[in-house]
């Protein structure tokens, strides 16, 4: 379950990062995500 959620989170972040409209959300999410997770 954890891996499934993590994969969905990674996919969501990838989608958000590819959408300029979501830039503010990308920056906010980056501040909420632990460094170890963000660097995966």
From Swiss-Prot:
Record-level Gene Ontology MF annotations: oxidoreductase activity
Bridged cysteine pairs (disulfide): none
Keywords recorded for this protein, A-Z: Oxidoreductase
Enzyme nomenclature, EC number: 1.2.1.-
Note: On the 2D-gel the determined pI of this protein is: 3.7, its MW is: 35.1 kDa.
Protein's name according to its UniProt entry: Putative NAD(P)-dependent glyceraldehyde-3-phosphate dehydrogenase PS5
Species annotation: Pinus strobus
Source lineage: Eukaryota, Viridiplantae, Streptophyta, Embryophyta, Tracheophyta
């Amino acid at each position: 379950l954890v891996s499934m959620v993590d994969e969905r989170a990674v996919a969501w972040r990838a989608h958000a990062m590819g959408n300029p409209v979501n830039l503010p959300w990308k920056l906010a999410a980056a501040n909420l995500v632990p460094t170890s997770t963000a660097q995966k």
